[in-house]
């Protein structure tokens, strides 16, 4: 399989994950495909598989202060790689939340070092922002 086919198959797997959640059913596959191009092109994503089937997906962005403010207000990422503030954008799990959280803690602790902030914005099924949270990377996650 060539790299382009592999990328297309991965994005297709992720679209299936998105489409399994009610909040994304109104979006077309084309809309989701276009949305996913940025994190895929920047390699700011991880797909989890269980029994050779996609089970979870996470993507993230690195924002500067200006884009971070916009993201916290709108929930929209306009520039996925413009700063050093890490935001977990989408965390979707069909049946693999534990593995996804464990991987995320380890990955960002190794990438950023200990004591660094990782942020996330929680949005409900009606696209209303209901919580902005953060966690701190730890040595024990490495």
Describe each model-derived feature in a short phrase.
Residues 2, 33-39, 108-114:
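Short linear motifs in intrinsically disordered
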Residues 35-51, 56, 62-67:
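A short helix-loop-beta-strand connector motif used in the catalytic cores of GNAT acetyltransferases and
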Residues 1-32:
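Short amphipathic alpha-helix that is part of the acyltransferase structural core
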Residues 139-142:
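Short, charged interaction patches at domain edges and termini
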Residues 3, 58-60, 118:
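Generic structural motif
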Residues 19-25, 31-36, 61-70, 93-97:
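Short linear motifs at secondary-structure transitions and domain/linker junctions
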Residues 11-17, 36, 40, 118:
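Generic hydrophobic, helix-prone segments enriched in Leu/Val/Ile
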Residues 67-137:
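Acyl-donor binding region in acyl/amide transferases
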